[in-house]
Structure formats: C-alpha cells, structure tokens
Amino acid sequence: MIRRPPRSTPLYSSAASDVYKRQVVFNPKKSWGVDMLMLGYCSIIAIIILLMIGMAQFGALVKFWPYNLSLTLKHYHFEVAGLGWESFYNSVEMAFYTAVFGTVVIFVGAYVVEKIKSDEKLRGIVQFFALMPMAVPGVVLGLAYIFYIISKENPLNFIYATMAILVINTIVHFYTVSHLTGVTALKQMDKEFEAVSLSLKVPIYKMFFRVTLPVCLPTVFDIFIYLFCNAMTTVSGVIFLYSYDTTLASVSSIHLDEQGDVAGAAAMAMLIVYISFLVRGIHTIISTFLLKRTQAWRNI
C-alpha cells in the first residue's frame, strides 16, 4: 500500500521548488522589540477602524441621535420606499454576478497577456486596456456608459437600466487591480510548463485547467472576494446607471442620509459590512479547506 508522504518530506519541497523556481522563501529573524512596535502600530490602526464601524453600528441602533439614545431595530425597517431591503438584495445579486463573471474574465485575460506569446502586439493592446480603468474615475465610467448605450439605435441599448450594465461597469471599474494580481501569480510559475506542453502537443486548455488554474487557485479566490466586497461598496461607478428596480445599498445609504434619515443610512451601511464580513468568512473557510486538500506542496 502506497502512502502519501508527509508534507515535511523533500517530495513536497521539490514540487514547490519546481513550480516556483525563482521564488525564495523569506524567513525574517525574530526581534521582540520590532515585533511589539509593529503590533502596537497595527493595533492602533485596527482600533480606529473598529471605532468607526462601532459608531456607525451604534447610530443605527439608537432611536434619535443624540437626544434619545435608547436602542431600537426600527431603523432596519427602512420606511422609505425603494431604499430598503430591495436595494440590499440588489447589491448582493450584483456583487455575486460581478465576482463570478469578473473572476473568469479577468483571470483568463491575465493568462492571455502573460502566457500566450504568439502575438506580441495583441498582448500589448490587451495589457494597455487592462491598465486603463485604474486611471479612469468611476463617475467618468458611468457617464460614458450612459452616453454610449442610451441611444435607441445602439444594439446594446437593451441592457440600459438593467442589472447587466451594473455588473459590466463594476467589472471594468475594478479590473486593473485584479488583472495585476492574476498576472503576478502567473509570472511566478515556471515558463517551462508552457514549453513542455507545446513540445508534447498538449492543448492549451488542458494545460490551463490541469496545471495553471489549480496552482493559481489562491489568487482566483482573492480576485473573487476583492470584486465582491468592492461591488458591495461602490458608489461612483453606478450612481448614474441604476434604475428604480436596480437601486443598490450603497446608493440607498447616500439617499437616506440626504433625506435626513441618518440612522437609516447607518443601518444600510452596516448591512453592507455584515454581508462583506459573512462572505469573507465563508471565503476563508472554503479556501483554507480546498488549499489544504489540493495544494499540500505549498507546505500550508
């Protein structure tokens, strides 16, 4: 009976080194003074962030700030029509679609840029457009979509005021960071994989699904959660694109504050925080489980 060797054996170390030949593990020396200093610095930042979130949570629970500080859940009822739970559900739906479709499009695009060497000009063009969204504000993206799609003669006019245009705009808005993340992960893989697959006449798609995708699975998970959380909180990119049926939680929070319902706005903002924490927790559990089972060579 053949048993799998423990992770500490040279087999796993050899496998990891074969995949990432150019990587050298950095093991910093322990320094109690520096560690405590950095712990204190990070703790101060964490406390400030938690205080801001806690203040928003407190504002969402009090009856009438700052005159009546008794606690209540009535602000989560969202009495203003069109700015309540429907907006929250729309945001979750939009963020989910953005994360799923965006992860596929972005990682495949990064693979084309980094691994497909047949046409250097095409790779340069794709790389240029992949980096462009970083320099374009979300408001400009939203206005550009409106001016382009609102025309009745445009064949894409049917996606105007739908969930589809929100998803497409959000993917484009946050494309660059995710693209660079994917390219960085692909650069770390040894280029000999592609050379060997070509010499053995292995199709590109088999190489992608059997080697590249499993090795880069942590990066794929990171792209997914990045797109989801940013889609939940984005305002500038969607402020001109939503309709009455596709109002988002981030936009509703602003409108509630403009109408004087500060507590309702805080409650809506906290819903965004809740769902982001929840999805992040699920992402951590699933990714940890899958990585331990499929990537033992990483010495997790």
What are these regions (language model features)?
Residues 14-17, 64-68, 233-262, 296-300:
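Glycine-rich helix-loop "coupling/hinge" segments at transmembrane-helix boundaries
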Residues 14-43, 121-123, 284-300:
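Transmembrane alpha-helical segments of polytopic membrane transport and secretion proteins
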Residues 1-16, 20:
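Single conserved hydrophobic/aromatic residue that forms the stacking wall/gate
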